[in-house]
Amino acid sequence: MAEINRMQYEIDYTEGISQRMRVPEMLKVAPGNLGANLKAQQDMPIPGVVMEVPERIVVAGQSEESPFSRPSDLDFISGTNIGTLALKTPPRVLTLSERPLDFLDLEGLTPATPQSEEIRSSGHLKRDKFSSENALRQNGQLVRHDSMSAMSTLDTTLDATADDLALADAASLRRQIIKLNRRLLLLEEENKERVKHEMTMYSIIIIFGLLNSWLWLRR
């Protein structure tokens, strides 16, 4: 919820800056004649939509016409030899147990005060809380990994069981089909035998009837 509020605040802040920001035509470090500048600013029309970039930026002491002296910071920056500056490569691994925080090196130089003791205790509490959160997070990840492994093993077992059941069902269906085929063959053979028997009986009955009719006519 706090993250959502912060994002909404940043969006509102950015929108307000974009709508209300106006870029001046000229910037100066030290103010000159305040009355003249205010009067000029009041007479100057403020652009409504178009934002214009100033033509120049004047630093105090840089121009000969400026009544202000050159700042000493610029002299220090210009007089510094770039060759004396060097960049130190940071270490690849940062271990909190060996060097917890940089401000702990100053404990021996600064005298112990109640505020420093309170800050130190709060730092220890934060480190303990951070380490406990890391331990809980690692334990949660291990438990999640174990549960996922158990679920994958169970899925594999269920798949194997389903395959075995499918093979058993296929074998039983094959046996039943073979039995049905044999039964059909037996029924067809019995039907053929019955047809032959009926034809023989019908032939005998017809011959006997014709013979009786001929004998009766002879009388």
UniProtKB/Swiss-Prot annotation:
The chain crosses the membrane at residues 200-217. GO terms for biological process: mitochondrial fission; positive regulation of mitochondrial fission; protein targeting to mitochondrion. InterPro entries: Mff-like_dom, Mff/Tango-11. Residues 218-219 are extracellular. Keywords: Coiled coil, Cytoplasmic vesicle, Membrane, Mitochondrion, Mitochondrion outer membrane, Peroxisome, Synapse, Transmembrane, Transmembrane helix. Residues 1-199 are cytoplasmic. One of its GO terms (cellular component) is peroxisome. Its main location: mitochondrion. GO terms for molecular function: protein homodimerization activity. Residues 164-194 form a coiled coil. It is found in: Mitochondrion outer membrane; Peroxisome; Cytoplasmic vesicle, Secretory vesicle, Synaptic vesicle. It holds the Pfam family Miff. It is a single-pass type IV membrane protein. Plays a role in mitochondrial and peroxisomal fission. Promotes the recruitment and association of the fission mediator dynamin-related protein 1 (DNM1L) to the mitochondrial surface. Belongs to the Tango11 family. This is Mitochondrial fission factor homolog A. It comes from Xenopus laevis (African clawed frog).
